[in-house]
Structures are given as C-alpha cells and as structure tokens.
Amino acid sequence: MANIKSQEKRIRTNERARLRNQATKSSLRTAIRGLREAIAEGDKEKAGELLVSTSRKLDKAVTKGVIHKNQAANKKSALALALNKL
C-alpha cells in the first residue's frame, strides 16, 4: 500500500485510466469481430461500412494512447486485405 499522498492519487488515477482503456479495447474487439463476421458471410456492402467505422475506432484508440499506431495500422491493413479478397 502506498505511503505517500501522491502515490495514492496515482493509484486512483491509474485505475480510472485502466477502466477507460479496458472499455475502449472492448469496443474495438467488438467492432473487429463484427467486421470479420460480415466478411465471413460475404456481405461486401455491410463489411465496407464496418471497415470505415472500425478504422475510425482504431484511429481514436491510437489518439487516446490505448494502442500503438503500428498496431492500428497493421489491423487496418489486415482487415482491408480480407475485405478486398471478397
């Protein structure tokens, strides 16, 4: 347990940030899962719309510092490649 006041505050701050990041990552995974399901079904129109919204969510996660920009670029590239194979 922290003995210093600033450490106690950092613990509280870090916990809030952890929960916020967890929620962002969860919504990202949900969006990616939905896109992959649309690709698996062969629904090109729906998958195209979902790719745009998923890419936007990935970019926002990078801006918030939740994921690294290279990870987002890698995921966007892989998802676009999968969509283009339809």
Swiss-Prot record:
GO terms, molecular function: small ribosomal subunit rRNA binding; structural constituent of ribosome
Keyword tags: Ribonucleoprotein, Ribosomal protein, RNA-binding, rRNA-binding
InterPro entries noted in UniProt: Ribosomal_bS20, Ribosomal_bS20_sf
GO cellular component: cytosol; small ribosomal subunit
Start and end residues of each stretch annotated as Disordered: 1-25
Gene3D superfamilies for this protein: Ribosomal protein S20
Lineage top rank: taxon: Bacteria
Record GO biological process: translation
TM region(s), chain numbering: none
Biased composition (Basic and acidic residues): 1-18
Family that this chain belongs to: Belongs to the bacterial ribosomal protein bS20 family.
NCBIfam families attached to this UniProt entry: S20 (TIGR00029)
HAMAP family: Ribosomal_bS20
Record function comment: Binds directly to 16S ribosomal RNA.
UniProt-recorded name of the protein: Small ribosomal subunit protein bS20
Organism in which the protein naturally occurs: Mycobacteroides abscessus (strain ATCC 19977 / DSM 44196 / CCUG 20993 / CIP 104536 / JCM 13569 / NCTC 13031 / TMC 1543 / L948)
